[in-house]
């Protein structure tokens, strides 16, 4: 008989129907042998999340697009890292207070370290949303140099100013060289799988290309990257590692990372 009391966790976002967070988390808790439920809830505004957590007795939540930044103002508190990043993808109930945390940056760093050394490398970061903010934070934390590119120049400049790093105009990507390209925008995400944020030829100046999108497993950007002799990195590792850190925060237990990864890969192969 387990000493672990039943807990209820959830995913909040819009949309959530495509998300593999529920099967990944359920597989993890099943493997761990703990009584946990994990459900997905589509909400229209970030403001709805906190009342739903309280009314449904949800003790931990994953927050996905488009609410990672907007949800901050409704929380009782946020961790120092989440406050610095300016985005929350994880909420934990600590003694009745709902605390915001960010595990996206941890997922990104762990995934990058599986492929490349971060310290001393230059990273071109596409986008200026919550995932981009986590990426910039993680790269700087590990001694890398991020350079931000965003189609809306003002948002890119604001992000660069917040982290004291560089932002360049989107058109400058064609001639920009970096060790790693990190793509954090939704362009290319299912069902829009035949879109890419960049022309294939623009990838010639990068060694590694990481797409934060995990569905599809191989985005058009990653297919183009391979054709341009870059090393492609799918968003699966990032997704699994950030989820594993959520589980550690919520339960205090070691998550079964290999089981989680296999669950995600199996689900993607069926699509």
Model-derived features: positions:
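Rossmann-like adenosine-cofactor binding region
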Residues: 161-232
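Rossmann-fold NAD(P)-binding glycine/threonine-rich loop
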Residues: 207-257, 261-263
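Short glycine-rich anion-binding loops that position phosphate/pyrophosphate groups of nucleotides
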Residues: 63-72, 129-131, 186-189, 215
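Phosphate/diphosphate ligand-binding glycine-rich loop within oxidoreductases
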Residues: 2-116
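NAD(P)-binding Rossmann-fold cofactor-contacting core
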Residues: 142-163
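Conserved beta-strand positions in the Rossmann-like core of class I SAM-dependent methyltransferases
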Residues: 39, 147, 233
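Glycine-rich adenosine-cofactor-binding loop
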Residues: 13, 102, 112, 116-140, ...
